[in-house]
């Protein structure tokens, strides 16, 4: 089985910034990868399209995926509100790692983050399920709109997304 690839077309205050594509590790975390894939295609009637990156901390990560409240308190999975941590096989090894944001054990919904550095202190707490395939330069450009507290200076949105 070939791991799926999905893409985000990123916009800054409505102006196109560029495309980021991700390989989803369905071979290691099938349930988590499938959730992100289906939210990227919108095939269940809801998902990431039009949502924003509400928290960007330069030298750490870019977080998004709250398509219900747009502020980090919402979002939902394709399996219902929340789903369990699948496993912690994959580690936060460096820039480009795609991992699930959560509010403690077994609280995965739709929020995720893209690491811009190695974040080994998150190993065993957040489920890694993918990595940036192309467009890490776009993620680095997004970082410039972040701040120490995570508030963004401009609105960073997923203008379009889907599966490649």
From Swiss-Prot:
The location annotated for the cross-link Glycyl lysine isopeptide (Lys-Gly) (interchain with G-Cter in ubiquitin) is 28
Protein known as: Peptidyl-prolyl cis-trans isomerase A
Q: Where in the cell is it found?
A: Cytoplasm; Secreted; Nucleus
- On this chain, the residues bearing N-acetylvaline are 2
Known function: Catalyzes the cis-trans isomerization of proline imidic peptide bonds in oligopeptides. Exerts a strong chemotactic effect on leukocytes partly through activation of one of its membrane receptors BSG/CD147, initiating a signaling cascade that culminates in MAPK/ERK activation. Activates endothelial cells (ECs) in a proinflammatory manner by stimulating activation of NF-kappa-B and ERK, JNK and p38 MAP-kinases and by inducing expression of adhesion molecules including SELE and VCAM1.
Q: What Enzyme Commission number does this protein have?
A: 5.2.1.8
Q: Which residues are glycosylated?
A: 108
Q: Which UniProt keywords apply?
A: Acetylation, Apoptosis, Cytoplasm, Glycoprotein, Isomerase, Isopeptide bond, Nucleus, Phosphoprotein, Rotamase, Secreted, Ubl conjugation
Residues recorded with modification N6-acetyllysine: 28, 44, 76, 82, 125, 131, 133
CDD domains per record: cyclophilin_ABH_like (cd01926)
Which Pfam families does the UniProt entry name for this protein? Pro_isomerase
Q: Where is the PPIase cyclophilin-type domain?
A: 7-163
Identify the taxonomic lineage of the organism of origin: Eukaryota, Metazoa, Chordata, Craniata, Vertebrata
The species this protein was found in = Saguinus oedipus
User: In which domain of life is the source organism classified?
Assistant: Eukaryota
